[in-house]
Amino acid sequence: MKKLLLLAVVSVLGLTASAQTEKGSFVLGGSIGYYKDKYTPDNNKLSSFHIAPSAGYFVADNIAVGLGLGYWQAKYDQNAGTINGGALRATMKEELFSIRPFVRYYKSVSDQFKFFGNLQVPLSFGNIKSSANYPGTNIRKTNAVGASFSPGFAYFPTSKLGIEFSVEGITYNDTSYDYESNTSNGHTKQFRIGANLMSPLIGVQYYF
């Protein structure tokens, strides 16, 4: 009798674990972060904040499609040399909003661990404001479209909660700049391959 009861409990746990990413399930989650640093001897400062909620639906077992939204704010304050015998400080403030449709595939390793690959196409827009302690401020609007693939793994401490660790694997960004102070525009393209294992991305997801 005890053996049958134990077998039943194990079976239920297995079904619960597999149900996390089965067809018809939903996932809600995202990430939030704050960073601040100060560099000597130039007294350069950097601070940033981001929040990125997301929601997805499993269209098939282990395959989810969804949409993420993001907000990013950063401020850089640095020593830019001297002017007229005095110290020159330059400040740059960046504010960006993003929309990120995504597709994600999970591969189960055990009841509590799953590897995944996340493909997303972020669309972002915002502005970057540069100024210094002398007359003159430069404001530029920025728009970008890109694509990225991020591998990672999810740990499930409970049947509905997942803690994720991932790295940026492959990224591509096409960014355009529109300077308000003049008629000149800027345009950059960036393609990068390689995972920075020292800077993992951490997120929390809720499955139901």
Give short role names for the model-derived ranges.
Residues 25-26, 32-34, 49, 56-134, ...:
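Gram-negative (and chloroplast) outer-membrane scaffold detector with strong preference
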Residues 168-175:
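Short, solvent-exposed beta-strand-terminating loops
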Residues 1-23, 204, 208:
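Bacterial Sec-dependent N-terminal signal peptides
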